From Swiss-Prot:
GO terms for cellular component: mismatch repair complex. This is DNA mismatch repair protein MutL. One of its GO terms (molecular function) is ATP-dependent DNA damage sensor activity. Keywords: DNA damage, DNA repair. One of its GO terms (biological process) is mismatch repair. It comes from Thiobacillus denitrificans (strain ATCC 25259 / T1). NCBIfam families: mutl. InterPro entries: DNA_mismatch_repair_CS, DNA_mismatch_repair_MutL, DNA_mismatch_S5_2-like, HATPase_C_sf, MutL/Mlh/PMS, MutL/Mlh/Pms-like, MutL_C, MutL_C_dimsub.
Length: 598
């Protein structure tokens, strides 16, 4: 075949392969045009998942009669005129090819009444040349009616999924834009049935209506800025993470994006508090000058490039990481005429005779080195002044003034040697003592290593253990580096090692188990990588071995010491594996269980 110039229709059909891969993509382009036109109310009607019909009506400024044909012409746009405009584009659309691409693979009717016009005008195209415009009746704004998607490209139509799947993609498109534009009312109708009605409202209310009550209940508000860069929105506490990524929404200057850099920054921010098989949920809005971000990467405009990608990554990571690190206070108590102040009781278990091997000595290293004390470089958010008062002291009688009670309250006792039960101002607190202590030890190890001052506890008698010759050979050149994290080892033979000292924070752990854990990590990753790239993973492993074990009986003073440590520890709401360390059971929830007040 000889070289020839393609027809405009074929060119548009080829371009449609990138811009309009499914009905949801066409819907996205039309909705963005409505938002760019200043619409305050948008109505969407779908038939057969958008394959049979997509109809979008808005109350925007409308299109003048003499520009209707241009709106359906390739590379015709009102958004930009020069390269300088492209570099500072603030509108959602700007390429001028979406409507032309849609019109090349579907039957399109465009009806619009421009502000100040006596009546509306309409123009239509059936996958070929434009038809002349004619008068029409409608109020101010624009209606775009798309029918028979891919009617003239049957090969493309075969790649579409079921009606339910295509509708789900369309509905998700509407919800995403509704999140970014809460000041705009949206309605969605599918096959004649209303599916979504959102009035113009505040951003928080829109998030609740779109993402649901579970998201709202576990959401933490984000508001951070650095120069011209700003981050706002909500991230969800790790305890509400799921295996799905469906609840991850990021908008840059009002545009929904799927950016690997942003996803990586947020994943890293959650890494220390989230199980590796779960995914965080968030709805975040990034704002920065238009010239600092390139949105002209792909015709679909969901991929972007930042001028200072490293700076954006660091900003997002630190903003979310600091937020997740702050101790989370218990939920606010119920208010209203039925609410009643809590009555605090003296815990009785303090008088019981308990068999505790180490008593308070187990927590002595923690009292001597609390997180953040004397460490100006590492900021530890404080739970409250009351929460840190008298941390090392014995339990006292609960005051009638709930404001004097620490956030996690005071211990009442233990359940099956696994859970600590405590009473605070809001009701009952249940603590997984191993998971909670594991986080406390982990954070203290990180703080000590950051200071390059991990205190070591020498063993009275060195402990010898056999090891694989390859493991022994691997650690031989790195004994000094291991000493930096509190381990003093000596090689006694090609297949044996003597443990002479362990980190003092882990002095109650089994030195053989600790050393074998170290050797296993070294065998898999090597010492250099382990201490550089996987430092936190190593410390998490050590903390797990060093934490108080389940089924060990604690005294009330020990339980209270653990509660105070949790209140002063970053990320105390999750263990090193992302599991929750404590739950709050409010008094009104207990009343509901026993049907009190009914």
């Amino acid at each position: 075949m000889s070289i020839q110039v393609l027809s405009d229709v074929l060119i548009s059909q080829i371009a449609a392969g990138e811009v309009v891969e499914r009905p949801a993509a066409a819907l996205k382009e039309i909705l963005e045009n409505s938002l760019d036109a200043g619409a305050t109310a948008i109505d969407v009607e779908l038939e057969q998942g958008g394959v049979k019909r997509i109809r979008v009506s808005d109350d925007g400024v409308g299109i003048p009669r003499d520009e209707l044909a241009l709106a359906l012409t390739r590379h015709a746009t009102s958004k930009i005129a020069t390269l300088a405009d492209l570099e500072q584009v603030a509108s959602l659309g700007f390429r001028g090819e979406a409507l032309a691409s849609i019109a090349s693979v579907a039957r399109v009717r465009l009806t619009s009444r421009h502000a100040g016009s006596d009546h509306a005008w309409t123009i239509h195209v059936d996958g070929g040349p434009l038809q002349p415009s004619s008068p029409a009746a409608r109020s101010g704004g624009t209606t775009i009616d798309i029918e028979d998607m891919f009617f003239n490209t049957p090969a493309r139509r075969k790649f579409l999924k079921t009606e339910a799947t295509e509708y789900a993609h369309c509905a998700e498109t509407v919800r995403r834009l509704a999140l970014a534009w809460p000041q705009v009312a949206f309605t969605l109708v599918h096959n004649g049935r209303a599916q979504l009605r959102l009035k113009a409202e505040a951003a928080a209310a829109r998030v609740r209506h779109v993402l649901g009550e579970v998201f709202e209940q576990h959401a933490i508000a984000v508001d951070a800025a650095a120069g011209a860069l700003r981050l706002s929105g909500w991230v969800v506490r790790p305890v509400a993470a799921t295996a799905s990524r469906d609840a991850q929404h990021v908008f840059v200057n009002g545009r929904y994006v799927r950016d690997k850099l942003i996803v990586h920054a947020l994943r890293e921010a959650y890494r220390d508090v989230l199980h590796h098989q779960l995914n965080p949920a968030y709805c975040l809005f990034v704002e920065l000058p238009p010239e600092h971000v390139d949105v002209n990467v792909h015709p679909a405009k969901t991929e972007i490039r930042f001028r200072d990608s490293r700076g954006v990554h660091q900003f997002l990571y630190h903003a979310v990481e600091r937020l997740l690190a702050a101790p989370v206070a218990p939920a606010a108590p119920p208010s209203g005429p039925d609410a009643r102040p809590p009555t605090f009781l003296q815990p009785r278990q303090a008088a019981m005779s308990l068999q505790v091997e180490e008593a308070m000595a187990f927590y002595a290293p923690f009292a001597a080195m609390a997180p953040g004390e004397g460490d100006e470089a590492r900021h530890v958010p404080q739970a409250s002044a009351a929460g840190l008062a008298g941390r090392a002291g014995p339990p006292r009688a609960f005051a009638s003034d709930s404001s004097a009670v620490p956030p996690l309250g005071y211990a009442l006792g233990q359940l099956h040697g696994v859970y600590v039960l405590a009473q605070n101002a809001h009701g009952l607190v249940l603590v997984d003592m191993h998971a909670a202590h594991e986080r406390v030890v982990y954070e203290k190890l990180k703080t000590a290593l950051d200071r390059r001052a991990v205190p070591a506890q020498a063993l009275l008698i060195p402990v010898a253990l056999t090891a694989d010759p390859r493991e022994v050979a691997e650690i031989a050149p790195h004994l000094d580096q291991l000493r930096e994290i509190g381990f003093e080892l000596s090689i006694t033979s090609p297949n044996s090692v003597a443990v002479r000292a362990v980190p003092s924070l882990l002095k109650n752990a089994d030195p053989v188990e600790l050393t074998r854990a170290i050797l296993a990590e070294i065998a898999e990753f090597g010492v250099a990588r382990l201490l550089a790239e996987r430092r936190n993973e190593l410390l998490a492993t050590l903390a797990c071995h060093g934490a108080v074990r389940a089924h060990r009986t604690l005294s009330v003073p020990e339980m209270n010491a653990l509660l105070r440590e949790m209140e002063a520890t970053e990320r105390a709401g999750q263990c090193n594996h992302g599991r929750p360390t404590w739950f709050q059971l409010r008094l009104d929830e207990l009343d509901a269980m026993f049907m009190r007040g009914r």
